[in-house]
Amino acid sequence: MALCNLNPTQGIFPLQGLSKSQEFICFSLLQSPRCGSYSSLKTKRFGFCIRSKFSEKEAGKLDRGYVATVNSKEIKKVGKKEHHLWKKNDSAGSGQKALNLVRMLSGLPNEKEAVYGALNKWVAWEVEFPIIAAAKALQILRKRSQWHRVIQLAKWMLSKGQGATMGTYDILLLAFDMDERADEAESLWNMILHTHTRSIPRRLFARMIALYAHHDLHDKVIEVFADMEELKVSPDEDSARRVARAFRELNQEENRKLILRRYLSEYKYIYFNGERVRVKRYFSEDS
């Protein structure tokens, strides 16, 4: 170490190559009174060397601690500035856009060319297809019982390759039922059955059974029920009653009793005040 190169005869410390702490120690030694012997000066010099090393280590620890603190603060600041651009929330204006679409459709004639042309203009300047606004518009039209507009909007969405979901199919089948279009409903149902054979929910089967029962197509009701049996989908209570009624209209009393025994037993279980309770099932004379 440079501090240890002390000339005992001259009493001078060479200051070249020394750190700040070492220079301070050397100046303190020069200002102190001359030592009586070389051994005492050597002992003090050894103590100064140890003290200078200790001060350098402490200074290094302080520097490293300060750098670590600054880096941690910088990391926290960077974390606050992160943005997840891949997360896309529902826009707040989709509801108003749906209302504008419903208002536009209500003022159009019932011609297919006029409706499709207006819908194409509505979506022309959109970067992405406004599927949320279109779905909300379908729900609004359904609540208003504007079944013809529901059919037009749903068909237009499907022609664009959008909205091919079970919810859209359910609304469209209901609109076909209410608008007396059983043939179009059957065509759509056959497409759904061949395309989504293993993923058709029970709600859609119930919709078709209700549609055919509403139009007194009892043989079609039995066909849909046979598809449910093949796909191992259990009918709900209303669907089972309609199937039993269809068997009765077709004079198949044995099958009717089988349906009643399998799916409509004398008792059923319901939940009342958080408890499972067995109650007697009600049977009407039409069942």
Curated annotation (Swiss-Prot):
Which of UniProt's keywords are assigned here? Chloroplast, Plastid, Repeat, Transit peptide
Give the Gene3D superfamilies listed for this entry: Tetratricopeptide repeat domain
User: PPR repeat boundaries?
Assistant: 165-199, 201-235
Top-rank taxon: Eukaryota
Concerning InterPro entries, the annotation shows: EMB1417-like, Pentatricopeptide_rpt, TPR-like_helical_dom_sf
Compartment(s): Plastid, Chloroplast
Presequence positions on this chain: 1-34
An example Gene Ontology cellular component term from the record?
chloroplast
Keyword Repeat found: yes
Family of this protein: Belongs to the PPR family. P subfamily.
Question: Could you tell me what this protein is called?
Answer: Pentatricopeptide repeat-containing protein At4g18975, chloroplastic
| Species, as recorded | Arabidopsis thaliana (Mouse-ear cress)
